[in-house]
């Protein structure tokens, strides 16, 4: 263990990186203790202490593929969940209902998209989201909630009963009665525990609307929670979503924002998409983005769809999926 000190945690880290002659992304950093100002800035004053250890290139690559260093193991071990056949069947059932409703409203779904869904080439809900039809799926889920509140026991179909039984067979805890305020409080406490384990001081708040829960994190160390290219934040959101999924049979949607990161990131992506489209038109060839989360890819697709002469599509597998922008 190599311990470095400084008047602040950041100063101690910089001293250690300089002495070890390694970049931050190749260092495993552990905060031993934070600085103490002492009484009147004189008595009991203590410097910050950090333990810095160089890590191998293999470890760096693995961490970069999942999430950045310094995060609890349960985040680093997290990847996009692989669904079982039963889970895919439940997911597909919701999407088929959504497609029927889309076509009833006079909106078309291309045969190519339908083929991708039926062949399981990509997650069905992801396809709908990227083609701009995820709202229909959300509306169907809200309608289910309204039926429950209006006395769903008499309206529940055999298909609904089979779905509930299938979820129970998967080992998922089925909650039929829930309080959205309580659910929001539970998931907020869960995320708070993870952030505490990261030794980051932060304040959490939440707001909600029916089945959508928004968590707001305010902190003086946003970079540690957001991570490189937002990877830590993405992992936190996946953990929170998985936490809700494992506790409730019906879907809740949770989004997490750190300070104003989500808004700022959206603005950056909009500008980036416009510049990328201009470059494609000027050079007459396709260009691809860095790996992005599903929500970020959706922003790129939306901006490109509003521009003439260019089109976009997603390629690759999670978590390294990216957007390709090409000429029409």
Swiss-Prot record:
Disruption phenotype: Grows more slowly with a longer lag phase and decreased final density compared to wild-type. Cells are significantly smaller. Suppresses deletions of PBP2b (penA). Double penA-khpB or rodA-khpB deletions partially alleviate the slow growth phenotype of the single deletion. KhpA is no longer targeted to midcell. Phosphorylated on Thr-89 by StkP; there is another phosphorylated Thr residue in the protein, which is more strongly phosphorylated in strain R6 than in Rx1. Dephosphorylated by PhpP. Phosphorylation is increased in an R6 strain with a C-terminal MreC deletion. The keyword Cell cycle does not apply. The modification Phosphothreonine is found at residue 89. CDD domains: KH-II_Jag, R3H_jag. Interacts with StkP which phosphorylates it. Interacts with KhpA via the KH domain of this protein. Interacts with MreC in the elongasome. Interacts with MltG, RodZ and YidC2, interacts with MltG's N-terminus. Strain Rx1 is unencapsulated. Belongs to the KhpB RNA-binding protein family. This is RNA-binding protein KhpB.
């Amino acid at each position: 263990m190599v311990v470095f000190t400084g008047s602040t945690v950041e100063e101690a880290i910089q001293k250690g990186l300089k002495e070890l002659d390694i970049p931050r992304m190749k260092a495993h950093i552990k905060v031993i203790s934070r600085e103490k100002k002492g009484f009147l800035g004189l008595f009991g004053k203590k410097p910050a202490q950090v333990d810095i250890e160089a890590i191998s290139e293999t470890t760096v690559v693995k961490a970069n593929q999942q999430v950045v260093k310094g995060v609890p193991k349960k985040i680093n071990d997290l990847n996009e969940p692989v669904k079982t056949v039963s889970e895919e069947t439940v997911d597909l059932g919701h999407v088929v209902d959504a497609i029927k409703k889309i076509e009833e409203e006079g909106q078309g779904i291309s045969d190519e998209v339908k083929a991708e869904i039926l062949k399981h080439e990509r997650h069905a809900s992801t396809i709908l989201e990227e083609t701009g039809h995820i709202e229909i799926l959300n509306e169907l889920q809200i309608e289910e909630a309204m039926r429950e509140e209006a006395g769903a026991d008499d309206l529940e179909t055999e298909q609904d009963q089979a779905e509930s039984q299938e979820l129970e067979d998967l080992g998922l805890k089925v909650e039929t009665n829930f309080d959205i305020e309580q659910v929001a409080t539970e998931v907020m406490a869960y995320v708070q525990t993870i952030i505490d384990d990261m030794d980051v001081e932060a304040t959490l708040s939440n707001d909600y609307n029916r089945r959508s829960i928004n968590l707001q994190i305010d902190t003086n160390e946003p970079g540690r929670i957001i991570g490189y290219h937002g990877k830590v934040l993405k992992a936190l959101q996946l953990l929170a979503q998985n936490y809700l999924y494992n506790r409730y049979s019906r879907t809740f949607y949770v989004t997490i924002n750190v300070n104003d990161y989500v808004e700022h990131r959206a603005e950056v992506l909009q500008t980036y998409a416009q510049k990328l489209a201009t470059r494609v038109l000027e050079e007459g060839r396709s260009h691809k983005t860095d790996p992005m989360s599903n929500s970020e890819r959706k922003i790129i697709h939306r901006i490109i769809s509003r521009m003439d002469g260019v089109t976009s599509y997603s390629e690759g597998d999670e978590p390294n999926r990216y957007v390709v922008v090409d000429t029409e």
